[in-house]
C-alpha cells in the first residue's frame, strides 16, 4: 500500500508541475486540469470490470463543484478561534448557485490521457454572456485577492477534494482576517469567486489544493465586550 502511494505521488508530481506554470485566460472559457487514479484502495473501494469507469465518474463528480466556484462563486461564514473566550473555530461554505443540468451537460472533458495509472483530462466550460458579466464584475471592482492551501486524504476521493477546497478557502479567509482586521471579530461572512484555475496535486500522501479568489466581505460581527 505504501509503495503504491509513493508511486502515485511521484507520478502526479511529474505530471502537474508543468501544468501549474501555465497562465490561461479564464474570461470566456474556463479551463483547468483534473485527474483520478485508475487504481483502487483495497478495503475502501470495489474493483470494476472497466478500469476507467471509476476515475471518469470521479472526475465528473468533482467538476461541477469546482466550476460553481469559478463561474458563480461560493459564500462562507467564518467564526475565528478565540481561546480567551472559549470559542471554537467554525467554517462553513456553499455554492452561491450550482450548475444546472444544461450547464453540466455542456462541460467538455478534453484531451484525456493516462500516465502511470492516472487518468488526466482538461475540463473546459464556456461561460455565457451573463456569466462573463459576473466575472468582469468581480474583476473590475477592487476586491481583495486571497489565497489558501488545503489538504485531505487521497483515499477520500471526491469528498477529499471538497474538504481540501474547504480548508483552502478557510485558510485564505483566516489569513486575510489576521492581516487586515485589527480586532479579532466574532464572525465574518462573505462571498468569493475563484480568480485562477485550481491547482490540485499531492503532498505527503494527501491531496493538496491551492485556490486563489476574489473576496467580498458582506458582514463583520464584532464582540461587544470581552
Residue map of PLM features:
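Hydrophobic h-region of N-terminal signal peptides that target proteins for export
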Residues: 13-21
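Domain-level marker for long, solvent-exposed, non-transmembrane regions
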Residues: 20-226
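Bacterial N-terminal signal peptides that target proteins for export
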Residues: 1-9
Amino acid at each position: 500500500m505504501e509503495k503504491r502511494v509513493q508511486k502515485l505521488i511521484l507520478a502526479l508530481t511529474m505530471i502537474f508541475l508543468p501544468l501549474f506554470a501555465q497562465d490561461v485566460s479564464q474570461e470566456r472559457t474556463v479551463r483547468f486540469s483534473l485527474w483520478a487514479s485508475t487504481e483502487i484502495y483495497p478495503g475502501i473501494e470495489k474493483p470494476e470490470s472497466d478500469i476507467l469507469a471509476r476515475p471518469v465518474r470521479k472526475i465528473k463528480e468533482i467538476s461541477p463543484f469546482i466550476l460553481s466556484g469559478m463561474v458563480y462563486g461560493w459564500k462562507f461564514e467564518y467564526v475565528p478561534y478565540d481561546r480567551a473566550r472559549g470559542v471554537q473555530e467554525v467554517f462553513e461554505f456553499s455554492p452561491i448557485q450550482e450548475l444546472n443540468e444544461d450547464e453540466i451537460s455542456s462541460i467538455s472533458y478534453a484531451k484525456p490521457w493516462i500516465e502511470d495509472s492516472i487518468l488526466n483530462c482538461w475540463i473546459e466550460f464556456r461561460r455565457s454572456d451573463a456569466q462573463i458579466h459576473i466575472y468582469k464584475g468581480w474583476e473590475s471592482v477592487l476586491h481583495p485577492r486571497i489565497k489558501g492551501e488545503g489538504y485531505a486524504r487521497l483515499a477520500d476521493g471526491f469528498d477529499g477534494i471538497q474538504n481540501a477546497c474547504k480548508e483552502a478557502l478557510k485558510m485564505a479567509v483566516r489569513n486575510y482576517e489576521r492581516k487586515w482586521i485589527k480586532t479579532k471579530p466574532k464572525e465574518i461572512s462573505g462571498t468569493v469567486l475563484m480568480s485562477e484555475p485550481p491547482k490540485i496535486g499531492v503532498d505527503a500522501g494527501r491531496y493538496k489544493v491551492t485556490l486563489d479568489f476574489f473576496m467580498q466581505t458582506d458582514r463583520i460581527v464584532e464582540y461587544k465586550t470581552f
